[in-house]
Amino acid sequence: MSEDPSGSPAGDNTHAPESVTVVVCAYTLDRWTDLHDGVLEAARQLRESGREGRVLVVVDHNDELLAKAGELAGPLVDVIANTHRRGLSGGRNTAIGFADTEVIVFLDDDATPEPGWLEHLLVPFADREVLVAGGAATPRWPDGAARPVSLPAAPSGRGELDWVVGCTYEGQPTTLAPVRNVMGCNMAFRATVFDTAGLFGEDLGRVGRVPYGCEETELCIRVTRHHPTAGILFEPRSLVRHHVSPDRLRWNYLWRRTYAEGISKAAVTERTSHQASLSTEMSYATRILPRGFLRELLSAPRTRGRGLGGAFAIVSALVMTGIGYVVGHIAIRWRRSKQSRREQKGNPR
């Protein structure tokens, strides 16, 4: 890839995408206000961009929400039902089958785009070698709530554990930069990627409120495997505000989410390779987390003990992720062993 000094892709192979589909997958009426605002803002930015395309709302096996979402349908917005397996990956794969544009953008149903979001997200695709681009997400706390002790923040304003609530975290790039994978709440793919690398793994990712993940990580690793010289870029100027529901401020959500992340990482490792699936995580665990732990610990005297809570959050999150990772590997190997025994019984020599 070639870039000019300003960080914008440049060169003889530039080609800005002329068409885009923005996909918003939804599963619950509890997020109706966020869904409504996000879809309308995405449609507004798409219209102002002058590009061909649509906003596609995919409802995940919820007839009541499907009927309500019909209110969003209009000249630039279509509403369809998930025809694949229940879950976020199935909804995204349904949308991929409907889209007929150069680029497919994925926006979470509780994320609201900031001005310039879409244009900044599409800038990297001016370089034909770029196949995937992702933007940033900043938390929008519940009304009247502040950042909880369980999600300590660095001086940059980002928290080491903000990924737990689907937001950009400390250690991620602050300018346009290559990354291993993008974040699911704000990302875009060239449509041709799905022809070569395949779709989202439907046995990965969220199903309703079950906080599994890593489906976009696994897909990005597959993209790199099929296209070794292709670009996957992070563009932090493409920004969404990600709503954080009150239940995600609690300690038990931190532990449930990090445990589930460990299980998801184990699944990705089994599908890809240890090096590919954990390269980013090793740097994060050995550089970013220790620095955050020390910062919180040293701040305890002047923060009336709040820093102790932050330090505990970082350690406990790492421990729960590790436990989930081990449990995930054990479960995968047990299922494989069970399947092997079944096959042997069904094919006696």
Region spans (language model):
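Short, well-formed alpha-helical segments that are part of the catalytic scaffolds
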Residues: 29-46
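Short beta-strand/loop segment that forms part of the nucleotide-sugar
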Residues: 51-62, 80-82
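Glycine-rich, basic loop-to-helix element that forms the pyrophosphate-binding segment
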Residues: 82-99
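Short aromatic/hydrophobic "clamp" motif used to bind/position activated sugar donors
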Residues: 104
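Conserved donor NDP-sugar-binding/catalytic core segment of glycosyltransferases
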Residues: 116-154
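Short, flexible, basic/aromatic active-site loop/helix in glycosyltransferases
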Residues: 154-179
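A short, conserved alpha-helix in the catalytic core of glycosyltransferases
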Residues: 184-189, 193-197, 204-238
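Active-site-adjacent helix/loop segment of glycosyltransferases
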Residues: 230-317, 321
